[in-house]
Regions:
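Conserved alpha-helix/loop element of class I SAM-dependent methyltransferases that forms part
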Residues: 1-11, 26
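A short glycine-rich, Lys/Arg-flanked "PGG" loop and its adjoining helix->strand segment in the class I
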Residues: 90-105
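A short acidic, Gly/Pro-enriched loop at the edge of an enzyme's catalytic core
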Residues: 68-77
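Conserved class I S-adenosyl-L-methionine
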Residues: 105-144
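A short SAM/SAH-binding and catalytic strip from SAM-dependent methyltransferases
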Residues: 76-90
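A structural alpha-helix within SAM-dependent methyltransferase catalytic domains
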Residues: 25-28, 49, 93-97, 166, ...
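Class I SAM-dependent methyltransferase SAM/SAH-binding core
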Residues: 14-16, 20-66
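Short alpha-helix
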Residues: 156-179
Length: 195
């Protein structure tokens, strides 16, 4: 995500799904003039206020679906691994577009569609010893809600194909400058061999 960001000096930034505010503080330390971080979790924002407090950061308890409540404009809207939890992606993208200053940027990361697509059957194909060989893909071409486990069972996230994502952005008025797919480092593969 950070490799896609412009020079932050003097920028106003909105962080969607800011969590505990770590990125917000990094943005300020990188020269941002003002950062607004929004998150649906009051508990995460309480941690953000304690651990990542700064006079240039404002934290708001607001779901991404309610961006139209924000009246100011930003140079940059950022979201790290949160957009796949929003049901109405089209509305979100239009709201973000409307919150940007002229020549503003929207930089986001989300769970890869090959991960979000899975909805039935066995997630992994394993060898006779139970070792994971590869992830199974199912229902990639069908956008919609999926349930997963992320600390708890039944977490809802929304799968979208690459074409759905790209076309939604273009229809809202965005020009796509760059797309990067994540590739795990050797260190990450050793640390998390089951993923």
């Amino acid at each position: 995500l950070f490799s896609l960001l412009p020079d932050l000096q003097g920028k106003t930034i909105l962080d969607l799904g800011c969590g505990v505010g770590g990125h917000c503080l990094e943005f300020v330390n990188g020269g941002a003039k003002k950062v607004v971080g929004i998150d649906i979790s009051k508990k995460m924002l309480e941690v953000a206020e304690k651990e990542n407090h700064h006079s240039k950061i404002t934290y708001l308890n607001l779901p991404m679906e309610s961006l139209s409540q924000i009246s100011e404009k930003f140079d940059l809207v950022v979201s790290s691994l949160a957009i796949h939890y929003v049901k109405d992606f089209e509305k979100l993208v239009c709201d973000v577009f409307n919150l940007l200053n002229e020549n503003g940027l929207f930089v986001f990361s989300q769970e890869h569609p090959l991960n979000t697509c899975f909805s039935e059957g066995e997630r992994w194909t394993k060898d006779e010893k139970g070792n994971k060989l590869f992830a199974n893909i199912s229902n990639y071409s069908t956008d919609g809600v999926r349930e997963s486990v992320w600390f708890i069972d039944g977490v809802k996230k929304y799968h979208r194909t690459f074409s759905s994502i790209i076309n939604t952005l273009v229809l809202a008025g965005f020009s796509i400058e760059k797309l990067i797919e994540p590739i795990p480092t050797e260190e990450l593969l050793l640390e998390f061999p089951d993923h």
